[in-house]
Amino acid sequence: MIKLRIITLLIVTLFCLDIYSFPIPKNGEVKFDVIRKNKVIGSHEIRFTENDDVLIVETNIDIEVKVLFVSAYEFAHQSTETWISGNFTKITAHSDFEDEREYFIKGQDNNDSFLASGMDGKLELNKNILPSNFWN
């Protein structure tokens, strides 16, 4: 159960795709409207910052569903990933639902493994782990 919550934020895979399999836009940003039943209910924004062989990816998702002008559902997610030479090396993420559920994780490359900590404690994960970041 502990690992399940962490794994919902990260996808473990043995076959990593090249980080640049998704072309990074020239302006460094991708913005989407989140649409439900033909109505915009939120936004999903991704910002890419490159400096030599380091890529920082910041993701912000904000969703709010209203029924008769009253908020019926809210979801927010923020994450920052660091990639060095195409390798996933660090993450900080926070997801907040409209109820009491709130998830956070911090993780970092550690030689032969990926060390992560969050609401369920600390975990040592496979080095080939990838975040579920919706862009790569």
Give short role names for the model-derived ranges:
Residues 8-18:
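Bacterial N-terminal signal peptides
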Residues 11-13, 80, 132:
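Intrinsically disordered regions, especially transient/low-confidence alpha-helical propensity segments
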Residues 25-27, 92-136:
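Solvent-exposed helix/loop surface patches that form functional interfaces
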